[in-house]
Amino acid sequence: SGNMEYGPTKNVLVSGCTLISTSAAIKIGTEGTGNFENLIVNNCIISDSNRGISIQIRDGGSVKNASFSDIIIETRRFADCWWGCGEPITISTHDRDEQTKSGHISGIRFRNITCDSENGVFLSGSDGNHIEDVLFENVTVTLRNKSKWPKGRYDLRPGYGQKIEEIPSAGFYMRRADDVTLRN
């Protein structure tokens, strides 16, 4: 859904896959001018990846009604300069630049997810554009050092004025996010 000429991405099912990536194993955005709707990812294994599941909205497209369930995620950092800092799940919405406003993220569900990673789950909305209606149910996050790269960092790139921020690693770190539920 990178260019509007291709239209929206709707009604997608990903199931029973083993995914390995030195970037993000599952990525929604960043170049998404069309909307992403009704996405289901289940019964997958993500291993040896820099990021597990990444929803990054920068170019006007929105994400709504996405469900991730029964997934094992193992992440680690590969280099200090690459996008991402070993997050198993990252969700962010930030403007690409002064002219390109980011879309909205809402209705995201994570169920029965096991994470073994160098960093925690990271949610970052922007001023006036908060992430909304996110559920984490039976999500386990184990933090372990696996690489030589610095810890305690979260990566907001790409985006207008966005950078890597030094924030102590936590199982879950959220800001500018409303109606977020952690259950079990």
Predicted regions and their residues:
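Extracellular/periplasmic carbohydrate-active domains that bind, remodel
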Residues: 1-184
